[in-house]
Amino acid sequence: MKTFYLLFFFAVNFVSAQKTSEMSFNEYLGMVKKFHPLVKIADLEISQAQANLLMARGAFDPKLEANFNNKEFGDKKYFSVFNGGFKIPTWYGIEFKGGFESNEGSFLNPQNNTPTDGLNYAGISIPLLQGFLINQRMADLRKAKININLSVAERKLQAIHVLHQAAISYFNWKKNYEEFTLYDTYLKNAEIRLTGIKTLIEQGDKAAIDSVEANIIVKNRRLNKEDALLKLTKARLELSNFLWTNNAVPIELEETMYPEINLFKNIQDYLNTNELNLINFQTENHPKINAINYKINMFEVDRKLKANQLLPTVDVGYNYLSNPNQFQEFRFQDYKFGVNFAIPLFLRKERGSLKLTKQKIESEKFGLRFEKEQLMNKIESQKAEIQSLKKQEDLITDLVKDNSTLLISEERLFNMGESSLF
């Protein structure tokens, strides 16, 4: 089992070994942001999206190609065919190309005949309908760019989720630590009281039965402390789930560690809740809403591509031909021209694909409306909870004041020998 103690925990964070065993909330969140595996996985997804963008841009890379075929049999040279050149794809499906051909042989296909010195060509191919305004490589590049933004939004969403769970674990650790400290104080006070009762019994000022009552209180306090210790141990182990090193090695939190003492004073600065404005909150700025919008944008690119595929394929190509030593004379009467036309008669595949893409868009839009409504309701619920907690805090503060007054009064009565024992 790979576990590390407190000294290593601070060494990873470049903190001095002489530092106290208090772990501040800000330091803890910094560790989670940097080293938690789920946050690192989200970072890898951004890197993968960037790699996909690089691949999509590769579809527009110029290409060099060459093809050579030669056949000889029975002392006869049937044919020798060579074709080499380059292609430059552009944004709107237009391709520029150029190259050199040199073919010869006794059984050469007549359409492949070239001059003795070979044949240069330079040309262009243009898709007039399908593939002009949008084609597969254009769609892939657009989606890859959108996917970068989608990955960033999902990374932010994942990081927020991890930090939220980590903060809850820290607060739970803080609560259980304070509870354990409180019951430890209760136990010490009960033991002091038991010792005092026994002394009074020995002096004849108290009945022996009073020690039984005091001992029951001690045992109850000891039981409360043991239960609080169990809760604290569980909270500490839960907190350890969020502590990792840079090499993805888990860190076990030591028992000597304790949460930040002044957390209540600093928590608003750590979480920037002073600048939180829930009244004019816009759901469009939420990373989950942004992620869904990016998904819809990607499906919209697919929809445009599928709609374009309903058009006929009409590709026009033109090549300027010339001998190598006459290429700059621009004899435009020497050329090769072609037209390619194709269209499915029923377009069932294309229509079905377009319909499916439209349904995916509608599904995402329904999900978007649901998420917006759910998010707004959650915000309203949080606002109501915050207001209620503020009222409860005020009431508890008043209770503390009243109990403090009662304590002072009981201390006076105790000094006079009239206080009740409870």
Which residues does each predicted region cover?
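Bacterial Sec-dependent N-terminal signal peptides
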Residues: M1-E22
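Bacterial Sec-pathway N-terminal export signals of envelope proteins
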Residues: A17-F79, L129, L133-R137, K143-K145, ...
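Amphipathic alpha-helical coiled-coil segments
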Residues: L29, I41-A42, I46-A56, Q158-D184, ...
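Membrane-embedded alpha-helical bundles of multi-pass transporters/translocases
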Residues: R57-F60, K87, K97-G99, D117-G123, ...
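Small/polar (Gly/Ser/Thr/Ala-rich) solvent-exposed segments
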Residues: L64-Y78, G93-P115, L119, G123-L157, ...
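Outer-membrane beta-barrel architecture
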Residues: G85, G123, D302-L305, N340-A342
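Periplasmic alpha-helical coiled-coil/stalk elements that build and connect Gram-negative outer-membrane
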Residues: V152-L278, E385
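Metallo-beta-lactamase
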Residues: A228, P287, E364
